[in-house]
Amino acid sequence: MKNLTDSFVYLGHWPSAGSFGFNTDILATNPINLSVVFGVLIFFGKGVLNDLLDNRKQRILNTIRNSEELRERAIQQLENARARLRKVETEADQFRVNGYSEIEREKLNLINSTYRTLKQLENYKNETILFEQQRTINQVRERVFQQALQGAIGTLNSCLSNELHLSTINANIGMFGTMKEITD
């Protein structure tokens, strides 16, 4: 390894007269040689450098273009999401309003139904009371009539003879049958 390093050191110290070698002393180098080397580097390196810079520029432009496309898609997706959100909020508001309306409607229906039921119960109660009053009145009439009839029969039995008694009974039975037909 040392021999290899020494050989490079010796290349830098070759004599300059009549031979070709590397001059590592920059201050001693001829400006014309430097300008030729720089010219060759610039001439050939310019194309390579331009290609590298153009490739880099194209990659940067493509990245920017892709970023812009992604940004536009993201903006579009955001707008779509906002539109869906507005639509969902509107539908939620409609459901809420419809729900409140439905609750109020059901409440009114329940109140009306309860009112009708109470009214029917009141009518049934009044009909039952009237029916019971009529039944009681008819029972009282029948008892009064029976008592009057028994009293009349008792009076007739004590005051009349058998023959008169039988004719009076037949007349009363006929009147009773007529009265019964009238009351029915």
Curated annotation (Swiss-Prot):
GO terms, molecular function: proton-transporting ATP synthase activity, rotational mechanism
GO cellular component: chloroplast thylakoid membrane; proton-transporting ATP synthase complex
Segments passing through the bilayer: 27-49
Subcellular compartments: Plastid, Chloroplast thylakoid membrane
Secretion signal span: none
Membrane topology: Single-pass membrane protein
Keyword line: ATP synthesis, CF(0), Chloroplast, Hydrogen ion transport, Ion transport, Membrane, Plastid, Thylakoid, Transmembrane, Transmembrane helix, Transport
InterPro entries in the cross-refs: ATP_synth_b/b'su_bac/chlpt
Pfam family, one: ATP-synt_B
Extra remark beyond the main annotation: In plastids the F-type ATPase is also known as CF(1)CF(0).
Assembly: F-type ATPases have 2 components, F(1) - the catalytic core - and F(0) - the membrane proton channel. F(1) has five subunits: alpha(3), beta(3), gamma(1), delta(1), epsilon(1). F(0) has four main subunits: a(1), b(1), b'(1) and c(10-14). The alpha and beta chains form an alternating ring which encloses part of the gamma chain. F(1) is attached to F(0) by a central stalk formed by the gamma and epsilon chains, while a peripheral stalk is formed by the delta, b and b' chains.
PANTHER family assigned: ATP SYNTHASE SUBUNIT B, CHLOROPLASTIC
Job description of the protein: F(1)F(0) ATP synthase produces ATP from ADP in the presence of a proton or sodium gradient. F-type ATPases consist of two structural domains, F(1) containing the extramembraneous catalytic core and F(0) containing the membrane proton channel, linked together by a central stalk and a peripheral stalk. During catalysis, ATP synthesis in the catalytic domain of F(1) is coupled via a rotary mechanism of the central stalk subunits to proton translocation.
Stated family: Belongs to the ATPase B chain family.
Protein name: ATP synthase subunit b, chloroplastic
Species this protein is from: Draba nemorosa
